Every structure is written in C-alpha cells, then in structure tokens.
C-alpha cells in the first residue's frame, strides 16, 4: 500500500516531495541538533545514523508482512475488505492526530476536485491491496514475496509500451532470475503439497493443492492490479501536485467508503460468521494486529524516507533488494512454512534477482544522467519505491 519494498503498503502512501529541498515533516529541523548538542543523549546521533535507519526500515517491513499474514491466516477468515477498511481508518486517524500535534506540517486541506480526479486511482488501489491480502492468505510468506517480483516485469514492459521506457540487458537478466525463482517456488510448494504428508494423506494433499491454486490465481491478479495501479498513478500524479502526505491521505481516505461498501455487500456479517472470524481465544490479538497494520503503513513510509535521507536513493534500492531475504525467512520462522531444498533455492534465486535488478537500475541511472546516483535529488519513501517499480 515494493519494495518495491513491501510494495503494496508503500505504493499506498507517498508520491514524493515537490522539490529536492523539501524536508520530511517528521525529521528534525535544522539547528535542532545543535541545541541538543550539550545534552547527555544526543538524539541526532540516532536520527542521522545510516545503520539504525536501515534496521528500522527492515524491521518495519518485516513486521508489516508478518502482521498481515497473521491477521488473514485464520482457518475461517473471510473479512478481507473489512480488514483493509480498518487499516485505512487507523491510518487516517493517525495522520489527523499527527497534523494536530504539529508533526505533519505539509498536508494540504481536502480538495473535492482533486478527490474526484484521484478516485479512479483509489479504485485500482482497492483491487491491488485486496488481491494482495487474498494471495497472502493462501500462500506462504516466502512464496508470496518471491512472486511479488513478477510485478516488476509487468510494470517494466508497461513502461515500454506507454511511456517509452527501456529494458537493459542486465535488467532483462534479473527478470529471468525472477521468473526462475517463481517457477522453483511453485514447484517446491506443489511437491510438498503432494508428497509432504505421504500417500496415505491424499485427501489432505488435494486440499493443500486446491489452496495453492487459489493462492496462485490471486497472486496473478495481484500482479496485474499492481501494475495497473502504478502505471495509472504515474500518469495522473504529474498533474495533481501532491506532496508526501497528500498522496497517503487521499489514498486511504478515498478507499474507506469503497472498502466498507464492498465488505457489507460481499462479506458475511452474521453474528455466527463474526464469531468464526474473531474467535474468543485470539480476538484481542487480531484487533491489535489490525490496529498495528494501519499504523505500520506510516511507520514504513517514515522509515523509508529516513533511510533515503541519511543514506542515498541508491542505498535504499539496494536495501530493498536485500530485505527480500529476511522477509522470506520471517515466513519460515513465524508461520512454519515448509523448509525444503526447493523453497530455500527459490528464496536464494529471488534474493539474487533483487540484487541484480537494483544493480541494473543503478547502472541505468548512471548512464542516463552521467552522474553518480548519490548526487541526484533525495526522494521520499514511496516516491522512490514507485520509481523503482514503475521505471523498471
């Protein structure tokens, strides 16, 4: 709402600063560090630390993926629209509180004309985040993370068709690795479903295979929904003149009525179904997870902007590629995803493909501008993630 770093969450948020000189509203003002220089603990040592910013970004991304998987993994869970609506509501409330507290200073007043122009983009966003949660519901975290790479390929060739983009040989090689990692991941998943429990459990194998097929179908839809959202947003965003928090605010605000209407129409709101979705033994944890997932959209965006500010957009891109590995491993650790030779190989190939892709983008940017990427204007969190995704 990637990565693309936790792509669906980041693309749901920022567009980018209107100028290179525009500072992130959460970050310390000039001179603030000097005033604190004599204090026992200098906060600027933390806020200006590249290592801490990278660690914070990685932890925020991992926690968001793990939280989403936990919330939608219940055996009877079927309220995805409602879950996403709560995410958006929590995010909007958090933005308003931050604005009232003076932490956000560049959020423009609501503009009805801009909202009407942006509404079709919000509909595409609903399709993207809904199919994302459905895919995550049926697939393991490692497989989900690996298959998300395919979105980069679709967006890249969408760029070629509609925006005159280009695909370099090194980027094409990374695409081949992404496809290979997805094929290996699917093969490993299917093999484990068919033979992991032995022939005596053929009924369970059939059920597991059916679940995987549903997950792959939702993942395929998510790839094209994400590409449609990113490419359409790029076309519209230029005339909107949105700043950082404007995009996040409109994206979440405009999706709230759509998500609630879809929930009331397509989801079962009977007391019996609500009890199944929120069983007494896990109800409090689920509610806390839903609230945190809304706050995490802000955490990820802030940590991304922080990482770019104290490092560079190049470092941020590389961190996003490297972050694929711990996100995939988190699925093995927290959700007991099957650890097989095939699954580990797929994770490794996907990890390498991300590094090759980031390297290809660095080389492409260098050849275009004939300057080091570190001298280019610093971009905000999702501005960079959207650019990484859309300018493949």
UniProtKB/Swiss-Prot annotation:
Superkingdom in the source lineage: Eukaryota
Subunit structure: Homooligomer.
Lumenal side: 67-76, 140-142, 192-210, 268-285, 338-340
Regions that span the bilayer: 46-66, 77-97, 117-139, 143-165, 172-191, 211-231, 247-267, 286-306, 315-337, 341-360
Family named by the database record: Belongs to the TPT transporter family. SLC35D subfamily.
Biased segments, Basic and acidic residues type: 1-11
Protein's name in the database: GDP-mannose transporter
Function: Involved in the import of GDP-mannose from the cytoplasm into the Golgi lumen.
List of glycosylated residues: 268, 273
Cytoplasmic compartment residues: 1-45, 98-116, 166-171, 232-246, 307-314, 361-392
This protein's GO CC annotations: cytoplasmic vesicle membrane; endoplasmic reticulum membrane; Golgi membrane
Main location: Golgi
Stretches the record annotates as Disordered: 1-25, 373-392
């Amino acid at each position: 709402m990637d990565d693309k770093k936790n792509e669906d969450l980041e693309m749901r948020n920022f567009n980018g600063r209107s100028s290179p000189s525009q500072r992130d509203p959460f970050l310390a003002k000039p001179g603030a560090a000097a005033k604190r220089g004599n204090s026992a603990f200098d906060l600027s040592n933390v806020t200006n630390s590249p290592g801490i910013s990278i660690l914070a970004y990685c932890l925020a991304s991992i926690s968001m993926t793990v939280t989403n998987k936990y919330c939608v993994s219940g055996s009877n869970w079927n309220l995805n629209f409602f879950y996403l609506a709560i995410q958006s509501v929590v995010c909007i409330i958090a933005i308003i509180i931050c604005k009232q507290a003076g932490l956000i200073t560049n959020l423009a007043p609501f503009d009805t004309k801009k909202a009407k122009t942006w509404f079709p983009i919000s509909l595409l966003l609903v399709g993207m985040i809904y199919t994302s949660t459905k895919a995550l519901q049926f697939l393991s975290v490692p497989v989900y993370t690996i298959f998300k790479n395919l979105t980069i390929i679709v967006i890249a060739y969408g760029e070629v068709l509609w925006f005159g983009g280009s695909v370099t040989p090194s980027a094409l090689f990374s695409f081949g690795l992404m496809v290979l990692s997805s094929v290996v991941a699917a093969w490993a998943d299917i093999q484990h479903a068919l033979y992991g429990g032995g022939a005596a459990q053929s009924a369970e194998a059939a059920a597991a295979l059916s679940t995987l097929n549903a997950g792959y179908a939702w993942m395929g839809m998510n790839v094209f929904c994400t590409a449609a959202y990113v490419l359409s947003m790029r076309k519209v965003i230029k005339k909107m003149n949105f700043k950082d928090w404007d995009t996040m605010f409109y994206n979440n605000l405009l999706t709230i009525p759509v998500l609630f209407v879809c929930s009331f129409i397509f989801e079962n709101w009977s007391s019996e179904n609500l009890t199944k979705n929120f069983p007494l033994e896990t109800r409090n944890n689920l509610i806390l997870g839903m609230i945190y997932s809304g706050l995490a959209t802000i955490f990820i965006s802030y940590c991304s902007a922080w990482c770019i500010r104290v490092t560079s957009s190049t470092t941020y891109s590389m961190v996003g590629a490297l972050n694929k590995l711990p996100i995939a491993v988190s699925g093995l650790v927290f959700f007991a995803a099957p650890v097989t030779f095939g699954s580990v190989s797929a994770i490794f190939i996907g990890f390498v493909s991300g590094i090759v892709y980031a390297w290809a983008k660095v080389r492409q940017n260098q050849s275009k501008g004939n300057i080091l990427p570190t001298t280019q204007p610093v971009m905000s969190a999702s501005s960079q993630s959207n650019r990484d995704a859309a300018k493949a």
